[in-house]
């Protein structure tokens, strides 16, 4: 069985799926370019029940994202990098499981994955790597020409991640500076 590595080419991503990973709630957002505009195609959350077993919860995430890949011709998946704290190693391990099935869904769909640290997403969106969530939500609202600030936070974060993926994949100069 051969291994194929899929990588994104600069300037080649016109439909991007942004993912804010979580075992309980995974936020996702699909954006695409229509002429000079960026358009939000779909956004939402995939929720798993805390009462389900870990494999059942992971399957729920995988099935949900596989459905998104089946509906949209995604060119690139932008995934928030794992953030962990030494006080909560168990949380980091569980998040690693969630990120694993998210990456599996992308690989199964033949979609390349780019990983972005939360501070990088914030810097690309606002110029400040420590920007508060409210500032990120406002930036997303303005850049996608939305009527209101996106809610819940998982969806807003996924939108920001997809926008970051778009800007960095389509502008190599920004990628070098970010």
Swiss-Prot record:
Q: What GO MF terms are annotated?
A: crossover junction DNA endonuclease activity; DNA binding; magnesium ion binding
Which residues does the annotation say bind Mg(2+) 2?
A: 80
Q: Which SUPFAM superfamilies match?
A: Ribonuclease H-like (SSF53098)
**Catalyzed reaction equations:** Endonucleolytic cleavage at a junction such as a reciprocal single-stranded crossover between two homologous DNA duplexes (Holliday junction)
- UniProt superkingdom: Bacteria
Which InterPro entries does the protein's record reference? RNaseH-like_sf, RNaseH_sf, X-over_junc_endoDNase_Mg_BS, X-over_junc_endoDNase_RuvC
Listed under GO biological process in this entry are:
DNA recombination; DNA repair
Family matches, as Pfam families: RuvC (PF02075)
| GO CC field | cytoplasm; Holliday junction resolvase complex
Provide the binding site for Mg(2+) 1.
20, 154
Q: Where in the cell is it found?
A: Cytoplasm
- Cofactor: how bound: Binds 2 Mg(2+) ion per subunit.
- Name what cofactor the protein needs: Mg(2+)
Its Enzyme Commission number(s) read 3.1.21.10
Q: Which key words are in the record? A: Cytoplasm, DNA damage, DNA recombination, DNA repair, DNA-binding, Endonuclease, Hydrolase, Magnesium, Metal-binding, Nuclease
Active site, per annotation: 20, 80, 154
Q: What does this protein do?
A: The RuvA-RuvB-RuvC complex processes Holliday junction (HJ) DNA during genetic recombination and DNA repair. Endonuclease that resolves HJ intermediates. Cleaves cruciform DNA by making single-stranded nicks across the HJ at symmetrical positions within the homologous arms, yielding a 5'-phosphate and a 3'-hydroxyl group; requires a central core of homology in the junction. The consensus cleavage sequence is 5'-(A/T)TT(C/G)-3'. Cleavage occurs on the 3'-side of the TT dinucleotide at the point of strand exchange.
Q: Which family does it belong to?
A: Belongs to the RuvC family.
Subunit structure, as described in the record: Homodimer which binds Holliday junction (HJ) DNA. The HJ becomes 2-fold symmetrical on binding to RuvC with unstacked arms; it has a different conformation from HJ DNA in complex with RuvA. In the full resolvosome a probable DNA-RuvA(4)-RuvB(12)-RuvC(2) complex forms which resolves the HJ.
PANTHER family according to UniProt:
CROSSOVER JUNCTION ENDODEOXYRIBONUCLEASE RUVC
HAMAP family per the UniProt record, alphabetical: RuvC
Q: What is this protein called?
A: Crossover junction endodeoxyribonuclease RuvC
The organism is: Rhodopirellula baltica (strain DSM 10527 / NCIMB 13988 / SH1)
